[in-house]
Amino acid sequence: MKAVEIFMIRKSFRPNSSEAIRQEAEDMINEKHYQGYRLINVDFDVADNAGYIYAFITMKRPNTY
């Protein structure tokens, strides 16, 4: 069983896309936290040539050491 999960959110560039992905990442983190996950890291990255912004969320699964 995996102890760590990495979630990815992808949004295309448009007005307020950075705020939208931040809010979606925050909502996902809160939802997973209530399920027992613990946050390890959040990283935002921009793919200049593809026109997307990504959020990578690393969380520790519940009841793992």
Model-found features: residue ranges?
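Terminus-proximal functional modules
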Residues: 1-65
